[in-house]
Curated annotation (Swiss-Prot):
GO cellular component, as recorded: cytosol; endoplasmic reticulum membrane; lipid droplet
Keywords: Cytoplasm, Endoplasmic reticulum, Lipid droplet, Membrane, Methyltransferase, Microsome, Signal, Transferase
Superkingdom of the organism of origin: Eukaryota
Family stated for the protein in its record: Belongs to the methyltransferase superfamily.
Gene Ontology terms, MF aspect: S-adenosylmethionine-dependent methyltransferase activity; thiol S-methyltransferase activity
Keyword hit for Signal: yes
Protein name listed in UniProt: Thiol S-methyltransferase TMT1B
Species for this entry: Mus musculus
Entry-linked Gene3D superfamilies: Vaccinia Virus protein VP39
Membrane topology of the entry: Peripheral membrane protein
Length: 244
């Protein structure tokens, strides 16, 4: 099976050789950083229609929280275009973190469309190192379709726990690997080396639920969801919350 995967990976590499050459020369990353926000804006507009009811169900739990300073202090990690803003309850104080500064103009548009929120700031940073944020400064951290593309999910979750107050909540929604041994998992393995370039570091075969369960949260609630688009190689999704 491994030999078949390697053969098919090489075949895909040959078919996408210009992309891999650009990546090897260091030219692809700036291109991807510039145009990936437009791709995400288009994709989230379509996928959120399919996931809207579940998203509302997940984030409706935020309104039951009481922030340490009144309104709920919410950090969105890997905020992207701000597509989640519509689901947050009135008065949330939202801080946004994303390593790609090109998302900021999309965030500005989302902020204008969601006046029910208080916007604190946009921080350009990686989730593995959010030194700009103080310990125990957040009531809620939201992480959707982010842990697939970070360098180290373990370090990101450590940072999440650092910035969350005791009893604070992590809300997550992530795509994960298909069941090992399945045909879908085989194709994820085949496509992953190329997909990482297309998806700005996105990994198709991560078992992110294991990272969350190992992260020493006091409680984890997790639910599986089918992928919104069968024509994409992303696998099933997990949604839920974890308590510090």
């Amino acid at each position: 099976m491994d030999a078949l995967v390697l053969f098919l990976q090489l075949l895909v590499l040959l078919l996408t050789l210009p992309l891999h050459l650009l990546a090897l020369l260091g030219c692809w990353q700036p291109i991807c950083k510039t145009y990936f926000p437009y791709f995400m804006a288009m994709l989230t507009a379509r996928s959120y229609k399919k996931m809207e009811s579940k998203k509302r169900e997940l984030f409706s739990q935020i309104k039951d929280l009481k922030g340490t300073s009144g309104n709920v202090a919410l950090l969105e990690l890997g905020c992207g275009t701000g597509a989640n803003f519509q689901f947050y309850p009135q008065g949330c104080k939202v801080t946004c973190v994303d390593p790609n500064p090109n998302f900021e103009k999309f965030l500005t548009k989302s902020m204008a469309e969601n006046r029910h929120l208080q916007y604190e700031r946009f921080i350009v940073a990686y989730g593995e190192n959010m030194k700009q944020l103080a310990d125990s400064s957040m009531d809620v951290v939201v992480c959707t379709l982010v842990l697939c593309s970070v360098q180290s999910p373990r370090k990101v979750l450590q940072e999440v726990q650092r910035v969350l107050r005791p009893g604070g909540l992590l809300f997550f929604w992530e795509h994960v690997a298909e069941p090992q041994g399945s045909r879908a998992f085989l194709w994820q393995r085949v496509l992953e080396p190329t997909w990482k370039h297309i998806g700005d570091g996105c990994h198709l075969t991560r078992e992110t639920w294991k990272d969350i369960e190992r992260a020493q949260f006091s409680e984890v609630q997790l639910e599986w969801q089918p992928p919104p688009f069968r024509w994409l190689p992303v696998g099933p999704h997990i949604m839920g919350k974890a308590v510090k």
